[in-house]
Curated annotation (Swiss-Prot):
Subunit structure comment from the entry: In cyanobacteria the RNAP catalytic core is composed of 2 alpha, 1 beta, 1 beta', 1 gamma and 1 omega subunit. When a sigma factor is associated with the core the holoenzyme is formed, which can initiate transcription.
Leading EC class: transferase
Superkingdom assignment: Bacteria
Protein name: DNA-directed RNA polymerase subunit gamma
Database matches in SUPFAM superfamilies: beta and beta-prime subunits of DNA dependent RNA-polymerase
Annotated EC: 2.7.7.6
Organism: Prochlorococcus marinus (strain MIT 9312)
Binding annotation for Zn(2+): 74, 76, 89, 92
Length: 634
């Protein structure tokens, strides 16, 4: 743990997520002021005063609970300036501190009746239903006040523990119990709502149930066995994390810090607010109304209805739309609940925590780089100068080209030849990492040697495309620069594209020509029917070597699919190789000319090959020449 500039940094080994107990939820938000007053409970649905524009006390933006909205200034204005740091105002009870505490200080709402947590009730699988071994439909009937559940059957012969009863059935049993001739001494006890659910969960002895289930598993098969295993897994998790099942029923709900659900004033005096504030307001209003009804001893049916509405309000706050009607705001738009903020691609985890922008990284469209080696990639100069700027500045100063960082930055902005020369020296032997989302296996991020290129697109060797599952139809890739020597060494030794030939999943080669390469090879060697085949000996279409054809093509005297006669003394695979020549002509010098469909072979009197001309297309010559050239170099 380090302490510098009054900021404390904590280094953690891991983050553990588990169910919070009601006491822990209250501890998150509760603070004791120096005068002994305990603050933290949000009791009013108000946000800010529309005349003074200051937060209302005990409301959702209360300064006493969450901290001052202005740095070093209390609510009433008695204390201002940093010299009063840490003082709690006697008049308004606000601590004089920085306003940024409103980003992490929490509050809580003490509920007038317990409510079930919708994640554990309506999640897949429903942990409440699994633990209680009751169908989810029946659990919902209990929670949403449609059915009673027997908590204690007493002396009643027809009732069983956890049995569901409708309103009419319970009324009949009540009449039976309280009849004059009733023989029932130990009265049965029933419950309804989340309170009954909490009682059922409290009655569970997890260790005993786990033992019984393990014995039962040995004697069961098929579907029943799978169900028992599912239940014991949940129970074992509860035991391992020291969590109690009744914590799945909430007695208090946390109120997240106000700066994470802000309220901002727009032009014209109107306010824009986070959806969470509306959802919290619904919960507080219903909670306060329920508390008032309980105080005045309102009829049971009214109290029960209010409890159900409170349950629905908390459900909407935690996960709007998971159960029942979705709560909508203006324009019939569904309000964003806590779950909506957390989950999904645009959620807090994937968007803001895992998807953070990183220093020394860039992003651009990829295009094919056919002249690159497999371990190379083309990095745009504009991107390279930005990514390698600290290295370039260091070298410029070391070579006495400039004296300070400011002068170096000015020189870099001009991007003259001197800077480009230094940049070339810097990137020499400095690997970079290329990543294409989604990174589904380890080959989704590989190291390459950068080569400076013009334009604004990253050039990629087509052979590495299958590993990245990339194509050149607009895909984007991210560039990362490894800074430390260890990471550069690791990138070069382990992550270089030429070291990752085989797939880690199957062990088969992953560097195979695919997509653009296959299409390019096909286009290069394809035969176009609209091009006429020239006669043998036609000066315009006869060439002495493959190089001559390439030069003529580069000089734009030939098109890619044009037929040519080219002298080639190597082996030729021909479709009519097994048949006889179409014509054999004896020449004056004693040699003979064999005329095949796609070649002309000339032999001397001893049957030695003097020359061979092949009828082919320019594209096929380019293909052959490239392959022969690359093979001869290795």
């Amino acid at each position: 743990m380090t302490n510098s500039n009054l900021r404390t940094e904590n280094h953690f080994d891991y983050v553990k997520i588990s169910i919070a107990s009601p006491q822990r939820i209250m501890d998150w938000g509760q603070r004791t002021l120096p005068n002994g007053q305990v603050v933290g409970e949000v009791t009013k649905p108000e946000t800010i005063n529309y005349r003074t524009l200051k937060p209302e006390m005990d409301g959702l933006f209360c300064e006493k609970i969450f901290g001052p909205s202005k740095d070093w200034e209390c609510h009433c204005g008695k204390y201002k300036r940093v010299r009063h740091r840490g003082i709690v105002c006697e008049r308004c009870g606000v601590e004089v501190t920085e306003s940024r505490v409103r980003r992490h200080r929490m509050g809580y709402i003490k509920l007038a009746a317990p409510v079930s947590h919708v994640w554990y009730l309506k999640g897949i699988p429903s942990y409440v239903a699994i633990l209680l071994d009751i169908p989810l439909r029946d659990v919902e009937q209990i929670v949403y006040f449609n059915c009673y559940v027997v908590l204690d059957p007493g002396d009643h012969k027809e009732l069983k523990y956890k049995q569901l009863l409708t309103e009419d059935e319970w009324l009949e049993i009540e009449d039976e119990i309280y009849a004059e001739d009733s023989t029932i001494e130990n009265e049965p006890f029933v419950g309804i709502g989340a309170e009954a659910l909490k009682q059922l969960l409290e009655d569970l002895d997890l260790n005993q149930i786990a033992e019984e289930l393990r014995e039962e598993i040995t004697q069961s098969k098929g579907q029943k066995r799978a169900k028992l295993i599912k239940r014991i897994r949940v129970i074992d998790n509860f035991i391992a994390t020291n969590a109690k099942p009744e914590w799945m029923v909430l007695d208090a709900i946390p109120v997240i810090p106000p700066d994470l659900r802000p309220m901002v004033q727009l032009d014209g005096g109107r306010f824009a607010t986070s959806d969470l504030n509306d959802l919290y307001r619904r919960v507080i209003n219903r909670n306060n109304r329920l508390a008032r009804l309980q105080e005045i001893l309102a009829p049971e049916i009214i109290v029960r209805n209010e409890k159900r509405m409170l349950q629905e309000a908390v459900d909407a706050l935690i996960d709007n739309g998971r159960r029942g009607r979705t709560v909508v705001g203006a324009n019939n738009r569904a309000l964003k609940s806590l779950s909506d903020i957390i989950e999904g691609k645009q959620g807090r985890f994937r968007q803001n925590l895992l998807g953070k922008r990183v220093d020394y990284s860039g992003r651009s469209v990829i295009v094919v780089g056919p002249k690159l080696k497999m371990h190379q990639c083309g990095l745009p100069k504009e991107m390279a100068i930005e990514l390698f700027q600290p290295f370039v500045i260091h070298r410029l100063i070391r070579q006495n080209i400039v004296n300070n960082i400011k002068a170096a930055k000015k020189l870099i902005q001009k991007a003259d030849d001197e800077v480009m020369q230094v940049l070339q020296e810097v990137i020499e032997g400095h690997p970079i990492l290329l990543n294409r989302a989604p990174t589904l296996h380890r080959l989704g991020i590989q190291a390459f040697e950068p080569k400076l290129v013009g334009g604004r697109a990253i050039q990629l060797h087509p052979l590495v495309c299958p590993a990245f599952n990339a194509d050149f139809d607009g895909d984007q890739m991210a560039v990362h620069v490894p800074l430390a020597l260890e990471s550069q060494t690791e990138a070069r030794m382990l992550m270089l594209a030429s070291n990752n030939i085989l797939s880690p999943a199957t062990g088969e080669p992953i560097v195979t020509p695919s997509q653009d390469m296959v299409l390019g090879s096909y286009y290069l060697t394809a035969l176009q029917p609209n091009y006429q085949k020239p006669d043998f000996g036609d000066n315009k279409s006869t060439f002495a070597s493959l190089e001559d054809v390439i030069f003529a093509f580069e000089d734009k005297r030939l098109s890619l699919h044009e037929w040519v006669w080219v002298r080639f003394n190597g082996e030729v695979e021909d479709e009519d190789e097994m048949s006889k020549p179409q014509k054999i002509e004896e020449l004056e010098d004693g040699s003979r000319l064999e005329m095949w469909k796609l070649r002309r072979d000339r032999f001397d009197s001893q049957n030695n090959l003097i020359s061979r001309f092949v009828l082919t297309t320019v594209g096929r010559v380019v293909m052959n020449y490239t392959i022969i050239d690359s093979v001869s170099k290795t």
